[in-house]
Amino acid sequence: MSKKAIYPGTFDPFTNGHLDVLERALNIFEHVDVVLAENSQKQTLFSVEERFDMVREVVRDLPNVSVDVLREGLLADYARQAGASAIVRGVRQVKDFEYEFQMSLLNRHLYPEVTTVFLMPNVKYTYVASTIIREVSMLGGDVSKFVHPYVLDQLSRKRAERRAH
């Protein structure tokens, strides 16, 4: 069995909490693919290309990490094609676990060889969610402790674009 995992998410934007979960996954797996989901049900601040660029910049110095985009299809099929033995999911609170548990059971049904691994971030990131980071940043709040400097620059750029319109 492969020691490769995939870490899927919308990552709008990629936060230090996401990075913490990724680093924890790298302590378990030989290789982790960060897979950006192009989710039509979510209205994102950043395009999938912008999110890909941000994640790639944040993880560029991490060994054994690659970044990809799942534009269509099932995550279980992507995991199978990538040769992944695990799907990594970050869980901050019970509310997260309920949804992730359902998804893990469905993915196991679709691809029985894959295991979902739930990882909790450092306690200092348990309240950090991309949605909150976006909202606070767009309102001019300081989110510098919660995102990589490159992501902070991209959030500032988006805020300036919105003000210009």
Curated annotation (Swiss-Prot):
<dbReference type="GO" id="GO:0015937">
    <property type="term" value="P:coenzyme A biosynthetic process"/>
</dbReference>
<dbReference type="GO" id="GO:0005737">
    <property type="term" value="C:cytoplasm"/>
</dbReference>
<dbReference type="Pfam" id="PF01467">
    <property type="entry name" value="CTP_transf_like"/>
</dbReference>
<keyword id="KW-0173">Coenzyme A biosynthesis</keyword>
<keyword id="KW-0547">Nucleotide-binding</keyword>
<dbReference type="InterPro" id="IPR001980">
    <property type="entry name" value="PPAT"/>
</dbReference>
<keyword id="KW-0548">Nucleotidyltransferase</keyword>
<feature type="binding site">
    <location>
        <position position="89"/>
    </location>
    <ligand>
        <name>substrate</name>
    </ligand>
</feature>
<comment type="similarity">
    <text>Belongs to the bacterial CoaD family.</text>
</comment>
<keyword id="KW-0460">Magnesium</keyword>
<keyword id="KW-0808">Transferase</keyword>
<feature type="binding site">
    <location>
        <position position="100"/>
    </location>
    <ligand>
        <name>ATP</name>
    </ligand>
</feature>
<keyword id="KW-0963">Cytoplasm</keyword>
<feature type="site" description="Transition state stabilizer">
    <location>
        <position position="18"/>
    </location>
</feature>
<protein>
    <recommendedName>
        <fullName>Phosphopantetheine adenylyltransferase</fullName>
        <ecNumber>2.7.7.3</ecNumber>
    </recommendedName>
</protein>
<dbReference type="GO" id="GO:0005524">
    <property type="term" value="F:ATP binding"/>
</dbReference>
<feature type="binding site">
    <location>
        <begin position="125"/>
        <end position="131"/>
    </location>
    <ligand>
        <name>ATP</name>
    </ligand>
</feature>
<feature type="binding site">
    <location>
        <position position="18"/>
    </location>
    <ligand>
        <name>ATP</name>
    </ligand>
</feature>
<dbReference type="InterPro" id="IPR014729">
    <property type="entry name" value="Rossmann-like_a/b/a_fold"/>
</dbReference>
<feature type="binding site">
    <location>
        <position position="10"/>
    </location>
    <ligand>
        <name>substrate</name>
    </ligand>
</feature>
<comment type="function">
    <text>Reversibly transfers an adenylyl group from ATP to 4'-phosphopantetheine, yielding dephospho-CoA (dPCoA) and pyrophosphate.</text>
</comment>
<keyword id="KW-0067">ATP-binding</keyword>
<dbReference type="GO" id="GO:0004595">
    <property type="term" value="F:pantetheine-phosphate adenylyltransferase activity"/>
</dbReference>
<feature type="binding site">
    <location>
        <position position="75"/>
    </location>
    <ligand>
        <name>substrate</name>
    </ligand>
</feature>
<comment type="subunit">
    <text>Homohexamer.</text>
</comment>
<feature type="binding site">
    <location>
        <begin position="10"/>
        <end position="11"/>
    </location>
    <ligand>
        <name>ATP</name>
    </ligand>
</feature>
<dbReference type="InterPro" id="IPR004821">
    <property type="entry name" value="Cyt_trans-like"/>
</dbReference>
<feature type="binding site">
    <location>
        <begin position="90"/>
        <end position="92"/>
    </location>
    <ligand>
        <name>ATP</name>
    </ligand>
</feature>
<comment type="pathway">
    <text>Cofactor biosynthesis; coenzyme A biosynthesis; CoA from (R)-pantothenate: step 4/5.</text>
</comment>
<feature type="binding site">
    <location>
        <position position="42"/>
    </location>
    <ligand>
        <name>substrate</name>
    </ligand>
</feature>
